Amino acid sequence: MSDTEDTNNDNKVEFEDRSKTSRRDFMVLTASSVAAVGAACTLWPLINSLNPSADVLALSSIEVDLSNIAVGQTVTVKWQGKPVFITNRTPDKIAEARAVKMSELIDPEEDQDRVKAGHDNWLVTIGICTHLGCVPLANQGDYDGWFCPCHGSQYDSSGRVRRGPAPLNLAVPPYTFISDKKIRIG
């Protein structure tokens, strides 16, 4: 009988150890879960504050109706606090811009790369001189494009810098044609 008693006692001890381990594991799991949920609840507002606010999102893209812009006319709209020039170029201006040799340009870029395919007459550029940030004047200068009154940079009808201290062409913002007469900038 002594063998049986020892066996029963061993089993009893094993059973007690398992229940203590089980309770301990449950408590650790519960405490860890509460800590993880607490950390997530604390970090959520912090991470969410990094998202842009509603007023910034409102300015992130604009739609522009092109139907009122006559051939040969340049219109200025405001996007993200910057002036954007939208030009409805004449066929002569397009041909003139495409005839320019790349070796003549300070910042070589093909005219076709500055416009959307199928909409070659529409040129959309950010209206800030790449030298010191002045706003160039449309249809001015020796190249009948833009002229920066601050330091004399001159851009052609494709917005490419041709003369002066500006190191780069007028930037082209991200834009898409929603229809033949409407674009979305941004």
From Swiss-Prot:
Cell location: Cell membrane
Enzyme class, first EC level, given as a word: translocase
Keyword DNA repair in record: no
Disulfide bonds: C134-C150
Membrane-spanning parts: 27-47
Pfam families, per the entry: Rieske, UCR_Fe-S_N
Keywords: 2Fe-2S, Cell membrane, Disulfide bond, Electron transport, Iron, Iron-sulfur, Membrane, Metal-binding, Translocase, Transmembrane, Transmembrane helix, Transport
Name under which the protein is recorded: Ubiquinol-cytochrome c reductase iron-sulfur subunit
